[in-house]
Curated annotation (Swiss-Prot):
Lineage: Bacteria, Bacillati, Bacillota, Bacilli, Bacillales
KW Cytoplasm (keyword) present: yes
Textual note on the cofactor: May bind 1 zinc ion per subunit.
Region span, Disordered: 788-807
Record's subunit section: Monomer and homodimer. Part of the essential Sec protein translocation apparatus which comprises SecA, SecYEG and auxiliary proteins SecDF. Other proteins may also be involved.
Location in the cell: Cell membrane; Cytoplasm
Cofactor(s) annotated in UniProt: Zn(2+)
Family: Belongs to the SecA family.
Gene: secA1
Residues that coordinate or bind ATP: Q85, G103, E104, G105, K106, T107, D492
Topology within the bilayer: Peripheral membrane protein
Protein name per Swiss-Prot or TrEMBL: Protein translocase subunit SecA 1
Length: 835
């Protein structure tokens, strides 16, 4: 074991030795950089940029660029980076994690690789956990970068699109992780390329990297829109479909399970809904709802395809006959069945776009991070993000006294001892920071201290607005501060001059399930070689102690006759606590790894759709792409109607009906002509006819209008289908674990079904685009429209629970926005009348 530890430590030592040589090169350059005037120092930036264009790399420039930043920092900020900070900067530049203890100057360290990588002009993102830190770092470190001639932007939630574009166009952009993720999602929902705000993701440095990539890794970012608008449409469509007659108003092909309105049915719909043309782009939503209602009534049968159970529609697996709880049909079919059966239509908010931090940050060309505590999660950083953790030595040796845990029999005994310790230290004037895991604990200790007459500050999620002020006072003589585990990160506790020789006392009221969080709390004391003391108080009733079965320990304390006021200091218990923490950390890592495997399925699909959207947005002419879609649609239709072995069983009439209803005019394709051809020969004359019709359509309007019409159709269909697909994948994901198939791996099942659903969505997109291009009437005032508008609601941080909930952005309809029922009227004149 010791051998392995040595080996691990040696790897880190080797890295430090290697970087020490580069630090010596930087030091050697100081004599030539120091005499430069401010103007000459600023001129170095242009010189570096020119050298990059001539073929030098950022690695070649590193020693000189770091020397320039060091000199500029001394002049502008009055701070000169130490050798260990230069090492931290090198580790960051190489795409690794610099583990630097609290107070070692991580923010200043980051300026070195930020400057070097910003010289490429591709943009560098500095990522922080909250907007306060982003604004603080942008204004403080921004002075240094601007002095050297680089532009600095800050990206805040409250900014307009134009302000965001300006922030991202800067050489260096300071932002929170949430805002970066949401901007990426929003950029992939826009309809014009000019509306995008982000540039390609080049290099990011994440401050408090463990908090963002580990603690928040399981928090998905979600942009959602209310799908309520559909509920009424499902009801109307359901009522309308009940009036239709088979054969007359719709045709149903039993073999292919294909159902569609006939000419009579289309006319009936236009009359019923008081519209001129059902295939008009304005009525996309209405047509979709009618088609799904038709399928619900004609194709789907109660107690065969689904059952009604406790007011819900539950799908029946066609192969095994089992109920597939938690699974829902996609594309609104499930809601249509709910309308048919008269149960509540579940139309909760619809996910328009989603991504996890794991997948967002893995898209950067180069990623690095800084934190005081990362070594315990090194395996995760290496396996998931391909980053090594490099422990940077401290500038001055750590002289902090980390005392062994004190274990009490009950919580009451523990808290009494904690308060007594605080009171004694307070009397001596020593500042005390009390770390708690839960808000309730911090409030309990606060009450006990108030009874003892000790003035103190509480820092938890309920009052994070005063966070920086409270932390700034925490190192003053006699200060007592109670903080929940994550509160106050990123802000240093500086000691008052009169207590420099005593230092800060950190008291932990219980061990957290992660050693990393305990280490963060310890790291609050003894910064930059200051004295300090840390002490954890545990009880046999703590959650972690209960987890690994401390009954034997409790029994031993009882046998020894130990009362509640007597703690034990036991290496055995401390070791047991540590092994329990390792087990919990292992479980959490497995959970995050599993989440990533599931999320990877959606990631691959998301990349395909977003790439295609980007191509559509940038393309001048989509005709070639659309013709390809028509070809696939026709080939699928032919294959579907001619799949039987015997020619007599082919459904050529059904094929002609399908083509006439969806793509061509009556009489364009004749049944007898197709009967003379083999299935592989049928597609060609049909496609030729389609292209002929396409050409006719082109002649009816200016080319520019035709090209815009194509884009309108493609965006409308792709965005509608994709949001429905995300929703369906959500339901599949929730329901996959409920399937009691026995020896089936749910992940494999999810991958296979998810892929099949994606393929079916692509086919559906191609068919619908082909139908609208061929059948829709083209209006003069064409406009691209968002299918559903996604709005942002940031999570409130009231309590630690908020951490694990998805960060959701919701949707609202403005009174002057177009109504979402598809009528084309403003909301206030349609469904919003009287609201």
């Amino acid at each position: 074991m010791i051998g392995i530890l040595k080996k691990v430590f040696d790897v880190n030592q080797r890295q430090i030795k290697r970087m020490q040589k580069t630090v010596e090169q930087i030091d050697a350059l100081e004599s030539s950089i120091k005499p430069l005037t401010d103007e000459q120092l600023k001129g170095k930036t242009l010189e570096f940029k020119e050298r990059l264009t001539k073929g030098e790399t950022v690695d070649d420039l590193l020693p000189e660029a770091f020397a320039v930043v060091r000199e500029a920092a001394t002049r502008v900020l009055g701070m000169r980076p130490y050798g260990v900070q230069l090492m931290g900067g090198i580790a960051l530049h190489e795409g690794n994690i610099s583990e630097m203890k609290t107070g070692e100057g991580k923010t200043l360290t980051s300026t070195l690789p930020v400057y070097l990588n910003a010289l490429t002009g591709k943009g560098v993102h500095v990522v922080t956990v909250n907007e306060y830190l982003a604004q603080r770092d942008a204004s403080e470190m921004g002075q240094l970068h601007e002095f050297l001639g680089l532009t600095v932007g800050i990206n805040l939630n409250s900014m307009s699109r134009e302000e965001k574009q300006e922030a991202y166009a800067a050489d260096i952009t300071y932002s929170t992780n949430n805002e970066l993720g949401f901007d990426y999602l929003r950029d992939n929902m826009v309809l014009y390329k000019e509306q995008c705000v982000q540039r390609p993701l080049h290099f990011a440095i994440i401050d408090e990297v463990d908090s963002i990539l580990v603690d928040e890794a399981r928090t998905p970012l979600i942009i959602s829109g209310q799908a309520q608008k559909s509920t009424e449409l499902y009801m109307f469509a359901n009522a309308f479909v009940r009036t239709l007659e088979n054969e007359k108003d719709y045709s149903f092909d039993v073999k292919t399970k294909n159902v569609m309105l006939t000419e009579d049915g289309i006319t009936k719909a236009e009359k019923a809904f008081h519209i001129e043309n059902l295939f008009d782009l304005k009525h996309v939503a209405l047509l979709h709802h009618i088609n799904q209602a038709l399928r619900a009534h004609v194709v789907m049968h109660r107690d065969t395809d689904y059952v009604v159970q406790e007011g819900e529609i539950v799908i029946v697996d066609q192969f095994t006959g089992r109920l597939m709880k938690g699974r829902r049909y996609s594309e609104g079919l499930h809601q249509a069945i709910e309308a048919k059966e008269g149960v509540e239509i579940q139309n909760e908010s619809m996910t328009l776009a989603t991504i996890t931090f794991q997948n967002y940050f893995r898209m950067y060309e180069k990623l690095s991070g800084m934190t005081g505590t990362a070594k315990t999660e090194e395996e995760e950083f290496r396996n998931i993000y391909n980053m090594n953790v490099i422990v940077i030595p401290t500038n001055k040796p750590i002289i902090r006294d980390d005392r062994a845990d004190l274990i009490f029999k009950s919580m009451e005994g523990k808290f009494n001892a904690v308060v007594e310790d605080i009171v004694n230290r307070h009397k001596q004037g020593q500042p005390v920071l009390v770390g708690t895991v839960a808000i309730e604990t911090s409030e309990l200790i606060s009450k006990m201290l108030t009874r003892k007459g000790v003035r103190h500050n509480i820092l938890n999620a309920k009052n994070h607005a005063r966070e920086a002020d409270i932390i700034a006072e925490a190192g003053m003589k006699g200060a007592v501060t109670i903080a929940t585990n994550m509160a106050g990160r990123g802000t240093d506790i500086k000691l008052g001059d009169d207590i420099k020789n005593i230092g800060l006392a950190v008291i932990g009221t219980e061990r957290h399930e992660s050693r990393r969080i305990d280490n963060q709390l310890r790291g609050r004391a003894g910064r930059q070689g200051d004295p300090g003391v840390t002490q954890f108080y545990l009880s046999m009733e703590d959650e972690l102690m209960r987890r690994f079965g401390s009954d034997n320990m409790k029994a031993m304390m009882d046998r020894l006759g130990m009362d509640d006021s007597q703690p034990i200091e036991s290496k055995m218990v401390s070791r047991a606590v540590e092994s329990a923490q390792k087990r919990v950390e292992g479980n959490n890592y497995d959970a995050r790894k599993q989440l990533l495997q599931y999320d990877d399925v959606l990631r691959q699909q998301r990349e395909v759709i977003y790439k295609q959207r980007q191509e559509v947005m940038e393309s001048e002419n989509l005709r070639g792409i659309i013709e390809g879609m028509m070809k696939s649609t026709v080939e699928r239709a032919v294959a579907l109607h001619t799949q039987e072995e015997i020619e007599e069983d082919w459904n050529i009439k059904g094929l002609v009906d399908y083509l006439n209803t969806n793509l061509l005019q009556e009489g364009d394709v004749k049944e007898e002509e197709l009967r003379r051809l083999a299935p592989e020969e049928m597609s060609e004359p049909i496609i030729a006819k389609l292209i002929e019709r396409y050409n006719d359509k082109e002649k009816l309007m200016p080319e520019e209008q035709m090209r815009e019409f194509e884009k309108v159709v493609v965006f409308r269909v792709v965005d509608t289908k994709w949001t429905e697909h995300i929703d369906a994948m959500d339901h599949l994901r929730e329901g996959i674990h409920l399937r009691a198939y026995g020896q089936i791996d749910p992940l494999r099942e999810y991958q296979m079904e998810g892929f099949a659903m994606f393929e079916s969505m692509i086919a559906s997109i191609e068919e619908e685009i082909s139908r609208y291009i061929m059948k829709a009437e083209i209006e003069q005032n064409l406009e691209r429209q968002e299918v559903v508008q996604g709005e942002a609601v940031h999570p409130s941080s009231d309590g630690e629970e908020a951490k694990k909930k998805p960060v959701v952005k919701g949707d609202q309809v403005g009174r002057n926005d177009l109504c979402k029922c598809g009528s084309g009227k403003k909301y206030k004149n349609c469904c919003g009348i009287g609201k």
